[in-house]
């Protein structure tokens, strides 16, 4: 049988574990926080989620990861890993009419040529409809492909 001081100690330990679990789960994935450049240039903060897709070339253009699943209102940052020229172009013919209209209205259909290592192209899915957003990668090698999947929030 436990005495009162043991009950209090167990209660405090459980409360500490519960608070630690809640704080770490509520803070989000630290890998999705914007870096200093995005904070400065776009004014992003800890509540903004930025998913990074690394673009590289060679015989074939490639995106890593090839599929990126995001919540509505998130950002996707395409970053070049090499000094080759790359361009990201969303496939308008493969999009729903609403998704196509969203990308055209927000002028996010295609990136400018990304010509140096660590060049970035950021797409903001603030009011875009949920769904699949396939894209083509063009550059020095054979074209590559990828997709951004936007999921509706809770």
Task: Specify the residue positions occupied by each region the protein language model found.
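N-terminal secretory signal peptides that target proteins for export/translocation
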Residues: 1-10
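Sec-dependent signal peptide recognition
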Residues: 10-16
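C-terminal motif of bacterial Sec signal peptides marking the signal peptidase cleavage site
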Residues: 21-25
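Extracellular/periplasmic metallocenter environments
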Residues: 27-42, 109-154
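N-terminal edge beta-strand
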Residues: 43-76
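N-terminal post-signal-peptidase region of extra-cytosolic proteins
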Residues: 58-66, 107-108, 118-121
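Beta-strand cores of secreted/periplasmic/IMS beta-sandwich domains, seen most often
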Residues: 66-89, 122-127
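Short, compositionally biased
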Residues: 89-106
């Amino acid at each position: 049988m436990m005495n009162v001081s043991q009950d209090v100690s167990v209660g405090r330990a459980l409360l500490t574990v519960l608070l630690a679990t809640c704080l770490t789960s509520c803070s989000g994935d630290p890998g999705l926080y914007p870096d200093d450049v995005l904070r400065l240039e776009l004014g992003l903060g800890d509540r903004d989620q930025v998913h990074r897709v690394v673009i590289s070339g060679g015989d074939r253009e490639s995106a890593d990861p090839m599929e990126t699943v995001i919540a509505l209102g998130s950002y996707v940052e395409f970053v070049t890993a090499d000094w080759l020229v790359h361009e990201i172009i969303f496939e308008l013919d493969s999009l729903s009419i609403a998704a196509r209209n969203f990308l055209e209205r927000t002028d996010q259909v295609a990136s400018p040529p990304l010509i140096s290592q660590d060049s970035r192209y950021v797409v903001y899915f603030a009011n875009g409809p949920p769904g699949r957003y396939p894209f083509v990668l063009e550059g020095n090698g054979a074209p590559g492909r990828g997709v951004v999947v936007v999921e509706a929030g809770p």
